[in-house]
Amino acid sequence: MAVRKLWKTVVQLFSKSKSEECNTEAGTMEVSFLKYGVRGLNADCSYVKSQCIKLSECECLYTFASDVCKEDFHNSEEMKVFVVQHSQEMVDGTDLFVHAEESV
């Protein structure tokens, strides 16, 4: 599903902009998330949140993932727009929209 690919891209880009500790935590979250799979835009947010809680030591990723999960997305385009708008400041020098487009 496009959302799963987009999420994977977001986690990868986000982890690159943070510390090595965050990079490791992002990888852990990505593996867990992709292993579980995504059945819908909002259906699995509770699972994502549970993963975020496990990664609470890595506050930057936890905050970002929590913010994504707070939104009520109706389609992948809405999610993409939200992610782009809220990630640009965090991922310096990276055109997230281009990467997101390539992943979808």
From Swiss-Prot:
It comes from the Viruses. This is Protein U9. It comes from Human herpesvirus 6A (strain Uganda-1102) (HHV-6 variant A). The lineage of its organism: Viruses, Duplodnaviria, Heunggongvirae, Peploviricota, Herviviricetes.
